[in-house]
């Protein structure tokens, strides 16, 4: 028989991260077709984000949110974006699991003549410097990575010292709105 899994110290969020809710403001002109371009489904954080995305869509009463699981590269982000934008009921908003895929998605939208944010809102996940260097600048979820690193270091020192390690929650990411997000166009106005 297998022994029960060992509990390891962890630093993490007490609740799943926001996703679709970050690009959907309540109201009559809210996004209803939201997609997510995520990392490999087998990775724990990708699975947590996918679950949070699905739960948020359900809470918002939205059907048909689409996931495209890819690697984290720009090439795969571009391929996923292109496949989403070629569908007849293309999304009005896409949430990306990292900034590189979001930058690639922005490039694909430009190549395809899809105006960001007039026709499509894009949201990046990491809020790296890349988000401020694009045109339009990318809205993103901001994380306090320095505080997260400090918490991880404190946990490591506690483990090394043989001290009891308590769970350490970290702050939920916050939305940094920039120029890549806007309410969707009214029905029938989209080209």
PLM regions with names:
Residues 1-191:
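Bacterial carbohydrate/catabolite-sensing allosteric modules
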């Amino acid at each position: 028989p297998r022994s029960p899994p060992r509990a390891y110290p962890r630093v993490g969020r007490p609740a799943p991260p926001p996703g679709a809710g970050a690009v959907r403001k309540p109201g009559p002109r809210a996004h209803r077709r939201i997609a997510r371009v995520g990392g490999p489904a087998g990775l724990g954080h990708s699975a947590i984000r996918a679950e949070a995305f699905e739960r948020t869509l359900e809470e918002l009463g939205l059907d048909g949110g689409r996931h495209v699981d890819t690697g984290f590269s720009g090439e795969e982000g571009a391929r996923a974006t292109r496949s989403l934008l070629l569908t007849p009921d293309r999304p009005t908003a896409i949430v990306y699991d990292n900034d590189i895929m979001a930058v690639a998605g922005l490039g694909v939208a430009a190549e395809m003549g899809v105006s960001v944010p007039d026709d499509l809102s894009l949201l990046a996940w990491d809020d790296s410097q890349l988000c401020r260097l694009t045109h339009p600048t990318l809205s993103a979820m901001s994380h306090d990575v320095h505080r997260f690193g400090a918490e991880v270091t404190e946990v490591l020192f506690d483990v090394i010292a043989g001290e009891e390690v308590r769970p350490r929650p970290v702050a939920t990411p916050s939305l940094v709105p920039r120029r890549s997000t806007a309410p969707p166009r009214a029905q029938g106005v989209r080209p």
